[in-house]
Amino acid sequence: MLGRALIRTFLSPTVPVAACTTQIAGVHHHKEAGDMKRFTGVTRSNKAKANRNTHVNEKLFRKMRGRKTLLVELPEDSARERESEMPPGEMRTELLKRGLNPYKEAQPRVWNEAQVTFQSIYGIADPYVPPETPASFTDVNNKFDEVKQRLQHKFYNWRMGTNRIRKKQGFEKFDVKTFCAKAEDIYERAHKAMEARDKKEMYRCITEYAFAKMWPDVENGSVRFELVSIVEPSRVVAVRCFDNPPKSGNDIAQITVRMHTRQKLALYDRFGGLILGSEDEEKDVVEYVVFENHIAVVDGEWRLHGKIYPKWIEPKQGTHITHQLTQKEAGVQVAKANALPLRTTEKLEEAKKEKEAANSS
């Protein structure tokens, strides 16, 4: 078509006619505007197919189109209901019929239950404790880091601690200077209640987090505690206030108190054997005790929550049942193995005689 139009222009030079070309798309497509019936969908590109939008060369793209779908075997609703009511034995048999290992590919149904409370937090908000002795000026970097941490700690004590507690109803006159006497009383009452196995008094003096740690000591044993005296006046080293869950307004306050006391402590097992400490020996103990209060409510009470163990605190005394041998005790120990009278040969001979007697009879 295009060639014929160009030839005509060259063959008639006397008549000045402008060259005009018309582009006709020879593509076989159902949306070609030149064919209104196909464009509107009246006729089909492939008359053998009911769908008007199928490709002209259907065989070429049939495999590709078949890969677009994925067949998934889904169990019926009745089968699901039946499986949910099956006991473990029948469920195991059903899985074995399908060729599945119930102990490898199917986890057993386990029921886990845990107590949740929003009046306490299961942990300590800020376990940082400022060091007892300041660092020397020989190492300037360490001294600078220590001073920086001390200033940050004091700022957080006011900003995220005392200032936030005083905004709560019933705590407008809160003062950390008068709190130490109350903390010492709570500390002694909590240990006396643990010694007497008084759960009601323990829940008044300690939180759920502390109860889970202290109760096993008296559940299968006994504790003897006596607070002899207070060596140094107790002082508050950290005050923190936070809300649980976050941004909920359910504020909980924690105060860390340094307590230097002289006390007697003895821990016995269920048979009456001494495990730790002594009822007669007095010891000086330095502890960093954490007290907690649910200040979101007006009638919140301060309770013992836990303890912080800094790096410079001396390790606890070992138990009396297991201890490390001294060099003298290790030298006395005999490393030679002794033969045990198992009487294996005698038992074999007796069994042989019984068998012969049974055969003869």
From Swiss-Prot:
Recorded GO CC terms: mitochondrion; ribonucleoprotein complex; ribosome
SUPFAM superfamilies: NTF2-like
Keywords: Mitochondrion, Ribonucleoprotein, Ribosomal protein, Transit peptide
Localization: Mitochondrion
InterPro entries hit by this protein: mtLSU_mL45, NTF2-like_dom_sf, Tim44-like_dom
PANTHER family named in the record: 39S RIBOSOMAL PROTEIN L45, MITOCHONDRIAL, LARGE RIBOSOMAL SUBUNIT PROTEIN ML45
Family: Belongs to the mitochondrion-specific ribosomal protein mL45 family.
Name of this chain's protein: Large ribosomal subunit protein mL45
Gene: mrpl-45
